[in-house]
Amino acid sequence: MRTLWIVAVCLMGVEGHLTQFGDMINKKTGTFGLLSYVYYGCYCGLGGKGKPQDATDRCCFVHDCCYGTVNGCDPKLSTYSYSFQNGDIVCGDDDPCLRAVCECDRVAAICFGENMNTYDKKYMLYSFFDCMEESEKC
């Protein structure tokens, strides 16, 4: 419980894109987005290595790969425009880099929603030391 409190305090200062991504996750899963996924499995959160532990963790792996294709802005810091229309996330930026970041986040949020049945609390706050298998390629 103490660790979750620390994570919550750290996230209170998060601005811009990460709060946008959390909002997308919340809309698609009904969960408190960032807290539910920030340190889940081997790929959700900062960095990532090893083998994705389940379909939820694979959503994060694919999200990391997507960020790796973004050029011209920092995916973790860029603020983009988006809206929710009839339950769908719609990215609305004219800037190609910001639109790409939004699309990465949109696809990941949808993936989390589609794979909620694989979410397993044993992978919350998962140890980095359990992610030592060879990493897959994007």
UniProtKB/Swiss-Prot annotation:
Gene Ontology MF terms in the entry: calcium ion binding; calcium-dependent phospholipase A2 activity; phospholipid binding; toxin activity
Cell compartment(s), UniProt: Secreted
Question: Could you tell me which cysteines form disulfide bridges?
Answer: 42-131, 44-60, 59-111, 65-138, 66-104, 73-97, 91-102
Pfam short name (any one) = Phospholip_A2_1
The reaction(s) this protein catalyses: a 1,2-diacyl-sn-glycero-3-phosphocholine + H2O = a 1-acyl-sn-glycero-3-phosphocholine + a fatty acid + H(+)
Q: Any idea which residues are catalytic in this one?
A: 63, 105
Q: Write out the residues that bind Ca(2+).
A: 43, 45, 47, 64
| Entry's EC annotation | 3.1.1.4
What InterPro entries does this protein's entry cite? PLipase_A2, PLipase_A2_Asp_AS, PLipase_A2_dom, PLipase_A2_dom_sf, PLipase_A2_His_AS
What is the top EC class of this enzyme, as a single word? Answer: hydrolase
Supply one GO BP term.
lipid catabolic process
Please state which protein family the record places this protein in.
Belongs to the phospholipase A2 family. Group II subfamily. D49 sub-subfamily.
Described by its record, this protein's role is as follows: Snake venom phospholipase A2 (PLA2) that causes a sudden decrease of arterial blood pressure when injected into rat, but is not lethal. When co-injected with an uncharacterized basic protein (which did not show any enzymatic activity, but also causes a drop in blood pressure), this synergistical mixture is lethal. PLA2 catalyzes the calcium-dependent hydrolysis of the 2-acyl groups in 3-sn-phosphoglycerides.
Please report the name of this protein according to its UniProt entry.
Answer: Acidic phospholipase A2 VpaPLA2
Organism, as annotated: Daboia palaestinae (Palestine viper)
